[in-house]
Amino acid sequence: MKNVVIVDCIRTPMGRSKNGVFRYTRAEDLSAHLMKGLLKRNPSVDPNDIEDIYWGCVQQTLEQGFNIARNSALLAGLPQSIAATTVNRLCGSSMQALHDASRAIMVGDAEICIIGGVEHMGHVPMNHGVDFHSGLSKSVAKASGMMGLTAEMLGKMHGISREQQDAFALASHQKAHKATIEGYFDSEILPIEGHDENGVLTLVTHDEVIRPETTLEGLAALRPAFDPANGTVTAGSSSALSDGASAMLVMSEEKANELGLPIRAKVRSMAVSGCDPSIMGYGPVPATKKALKRAGLSLDDIELFELNEAFAAQSLPCIKDLGLLDVMDEKVNLNGGAIALGHPLGCSGSRIATTLINNMERTGAKLGVATMCIGLGQGIATVFERP
């Protein structure tokens, strides 16, 4: 089996979904920009040697329909010989894209792949056209398809208070703002044109979604968003709605060495797992444990974790049961997470992996885990190792 390595990883800035910088920019344009960007940043890679593109996207309709991976590749002017497929594991779609490409490379079916994902939640809302089968109600409660209520359930099961959620949300914005000011995101963001609040074309270089003005008092004043009578989850402690894309250049270790490309990280192991849909946010716990077992590692071996923050009420139980509460500030989401940056569904998997790899390089960490929950009860995790 061949070793799989990441030689480059980038993302767009995260744009606010409601009247944000990408309101006139289509999902295919966000995607094509990154595909072209990876090749421009790595001129030693012959595009004709790329086997396949795996691109995550959840709402595959409207501008994101009819295989957005292929549409974006053609829009980017990539060789027509490069195949492309769109991957959907809901929130874990672009991490699944990485897993699919990695397996193809491991068994020799590919040497070089582009992976990534996109979601334009401003143009294609999360619930657009969704029609659940009525028969699901025999085994799954209707509320299991309502992500906010699953977060409420998970938070109550683990005794997570409103105050803990608000503090976690505040920290996400503070860390993301600090990362922006300190330039920690500069190595992963590929600037792209968008439009400012006046509709003027502008170069977007930073995330639009972060709210540095957030305070505990402001968060405490928000009403519960999903369970008005007894809830604790608010818009402020939930992942923001944002638009964005992310991408990675993935290849065999042999090919990277042949091309003289720096190996930024190796895919050490991968895993997915299912869990009760009513507590879908718990998926990272079994997925992470499974991935670590496959890598022959323990939780103590991992120096950095990147956990997608769907909700504070969902993140904190996962952090608790992974034994990370006491080291959360030093090990988990150093640059904040989706509460501050947003969660463009198909983009997030490779986005958090990209942020993890950049943080591993910045801090000198050798081993890291990127993991996320997935709607309707799944989790996905990837263990990365720096050379």
From Swiss-Prot:
Signal peptide: none annotated. The keyword Acyltransferase applies. The active site is at C91 (acyl-thioester intermediate), H343 (proton acceptor), C373 (proton acceptor). Its main location: cytoplasm. One of its GO terms (biological process) is phenylacetate catabolic process. GO terms for cellular component: cytoplasm. It comes from the Bacteria. Pfam families: Thiolase_C, Thiolase_N. InterPro entries: FadA, Thiolase, Thiolase-like, Thiolase-like_sf_Thiolase, Thiolase_acyl_enz_int_AS, Thiolase_AS, Thiolase_C, Thiolase_CS. Its EC number is 2.3.1.16. Keywords: Acyltransferase, Cytoplasm, Fatty acid metabolism, Lipid degradation, Lipid metabolism, Transferase. HAMAP family: FadA (MF_01620). This is 3-ketoacyl-CoA thiolase. It comes from Aliivibrio fischeri (strain MJ11) (Vibrio fischeri).
